[in-house]
Amino acid sequence: MHAMQYEITLPADYDMGIIRKRVADKGHLLDTYPGLGLKAYLIRERGLDGSPVNQYAPFYLWRTPQGMNSFLWGPGFRGLSADFGRPAVRHWLGAGLALGEAGGGDTGRGDTGPGEAGPGAEGPTTATRETVRLPEAADPAEAVEQALAGLPAHPALHTAAVAVDPSRWELLRFALWRGPAPEDVPGARYRVLHLSRPELDRLPAGRHW
């Protein structure tokens, strides 16, 4: 499993309806993408949920490196780069995955529609992402084990992942939630406009080594 994200920070007065329309028009294109565990189409809006910026920040869990490479070198990412400029792409090695109670009713395709889904909608509606730099004296394996043990057990949890960027020794905790994210969960908060999850069911839960 490989985690991946790019962040496109937009002007303070940017009409985020443009991003919503883009996702509404194109989000379904990855609903059956080979090698993709999930893609969460995420946004942050200035002044909401503590965000200082407007941002489009899709997050991916790839089941295969071939799928990730096919996307990055293919027309989808090429089109995004043409529209917004080529963003820096962050990449973490997957260390573990938890599938929550709120993810059990999904259909296996893109379940969350565009816009802020209501309480009865299928799929997650919010996400959290926390990154932590591991101290030089820390044992990376122990830190990952602790992060896996600390994955939230919450009825609103859809999916949670732990991953590591060994070039920076940075630990990533990412979670998707149905409804508002719990207040005690740290990290940046996002709204989910759409979820594509073609091969999420093929990603093993638990530790990934």
Show the residue positions of the predicted features.
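Conserved residues at the C-terminal ends of beta-strands
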Residues: 42
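Hydrophobic/aromatic-rich structural module bridging two neighboring secondary-structure elements via a short loop
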Residues: 45-90
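Short S/T/G/P-rich N-terminal loop/turn motif that feeds into the first structured element of a domain
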Residues: 1-33, 37-38, 47-48, 67-71, ...
